[in-house]
Amino acid sequence: MSTKRELVLKAFRGEAVDRVPVGFWHHFTREDEWLKGFSNPEIIEKNLNGHKNFLHKVKPDFVKLMSDGYFAYPNPSIHKGLENISDLAGIEPLGADHPWITEQVELVKKIRAGFEEDIVAIYNIFAPVTYFKWLVGEVSGGDDLIANFFDQDAATLKKVLDTIGQDIASLSQRIIKEAGADGIYLSVQSIQDARVSQEVYKQVIAPSELHVLETAKEAGGVNILHICGYEGARNDIHLFTDYPAPVINWAVGPEGISLAEGREIFGGRTVLGGFENGKKGLLYTGDKAAIQAETKRIIAETGTTGLVIGADCTIPSDIDEERIEWVREAAAE
């Protein structure tokens, strides 16, 4: 019988496994705290304690370490209300030793120090364009601003994203090499504005995302690509087929693409997901029999290799965590 670490890494590589591993996660802080943790010990302590309690109660097969509190990338050149991308023509990276990066390295070290067993730990990272959207807009939104900036000056927008990407790559590298994370969970999302075509995305936005993933890979990371459908965002998952990550996760229902279909689109790579993540989904509302039946249906449809059972995205923080164990029980049968 494989250890949890062996089991998960085999699944990530698409090898035969003793049972299909399971991975679910949720936030440990409120949404209004996600952007406010930098140099705010109370929020970071809340996140730390949340991880400790979750790991003790759930004993997961592997864990996504949540970056709650560090959603705001603190580059002094960028501010809310920015109207002209040309104002950022002189933007510089924070640098690999900036406290925003170092604090996250320390966070991962502290979480891992409290592990009760040796499991794979993947750290949550957002795409450079997402950090940028949140600084000039809101946690959910800002896509129209990105499209505006593209219309104004695509070259400067690309420079801004590449600069942010340098820092996110440095963060990823240090998280893996210094803090001992096994890789990153990179959250990407199509821009929710028709002005940003697939071609524009690949030319202006994708290079910064690819740099982050490639840096994490070179640092030894085993990485997950999360194509995020938060609050109803829709994605063209074909945009991301050349992204170097061995495990792919997307919103199966909203995108209308099953795990089996997605695996083909991504050339046979391991797929993660299957369950809707929200409060209207089966995982949150269903009884044990229904949840276990759905688990078995997902496995029957997708196969036992190259599969990790999970959700479209982060599950509700108030979920009865026994439900995760129901999935794991069914996946082991």
Predicted feature locations:
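Alpha/beta catalytic barrel-like cores
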Residues: W25-D32, K52, D61-G95, P99
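N-terminal accessory beta-strand-rich subdomains and adjacent acidic, glycine-rich linkers
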Residues: I44, G50-F54
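Surface-exposed strand-loop-strand hairpins of Gram-negative outer-membrane beta-barrel proteins
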Residues: L35-K46
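Active-site loop segments of alpha/beta catalytic cores
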Residues: M1-T29, K36-G37, G50, D61, ...
